[in-house]
Swiss-Prot record:
SUPFAM superfamilies, per the entry: Histone-fold
Name of the encoding gene: HHT21
Modified residues (N6-methyllysine): 5, 10, 19, 24, 28, 37, 80
PTM sites of type N6-acetyllysine: 10, 15, 19, 24, 28, 37, 57, 65
Protein name: Histone H3.1/H3.2
Organism, scientific name: Candida albicans (strain SC5314 / ATCC MYA-2876) (Yeast)
C-alpha cells in the first residue's frame, strides 16, 4: 500500500480517553529519583550525519567572511605592505579556498574508507595531498 502524507484533523468527538489504573497513576505522580531530568542526547553519529546532509544541500559559504578577510590580509602583508583588496576579490578567494578544502576532505575521506576506517586522520590528508601531487 502506498504511503500518504498525514494531515492534522479537527476532532469531532469520538471516544473519551480511558482512565489510568491506580498503579500507573501512582507511578506517574511520584517524583523520580533525584528529580532532575537528563537532557536528551542523540546517538553518536546521528547529529554528524544530519549536519552532513544539511551542508551538502546548502550553497552558502561555510567560513565566516571577516575572519577569512583578516587571514588574507595577514598573509598578503608578508609579500607587500599596504595592499588593498576589492570585496569581490576576497569573495572569489573564499569560494576557491572552500572548493579546494571540500575536494581535499572528499579525497581524505576516501583514503580513510580505503583503510577500512570511518574517521579521517592526519595520515589520510597527507596521502590525499601526496596523490594529488601537492606535496612529496
Amino acid at each position: 500500500m502506498a504511503r500518504t502524507k498525514q494531515t492534522a484533523r479537527k476532532s469531532t468527538g469520538g471516544k473519551a480517553p480511558r482512565k489510568q489504573l491506580a498503579s500507573k497513576a501512582a507511578r506517574k505522580s511520584a517524583p523520580s529519583t533525584g528529580g532532575v531530568k537528563k537532557p536528551h542526547r542523540y546517538k553518536p553519529g546521528t547529529v554528524a550525519l544530519r549536519e552532513i546532509r544539511r551542508f551538502q544541500k546548502s550553497t552558502e559559504l561555510l567560513i565566516r567572511k571577516l575572519p577569512f578577510q583578516r587571514l588574507v590580509r595577514e598573509i598578503a602583508q608578508d609579500f607587500k605592505t599596504d595592499l588593498r583588496f576589492q570585496s569581490s576579490a576576497i569573495g572569489a578567494l573564499q569560494e576557491a579556498v572552500e572548493a579546494y578544502l571540500v575536494g581535499l576532505f572528499e579525497d581524505t575521506n576516501l583514503c580513510a574508507i580505503h583503510a577500512k576506517r570511518v574517521t579521517i586522520q592526519k595520515k589520510d590528508m597527507q596521502l590525499a595531498r601526496r596523490l594529488r601531487g601537492e606535496r612529496s
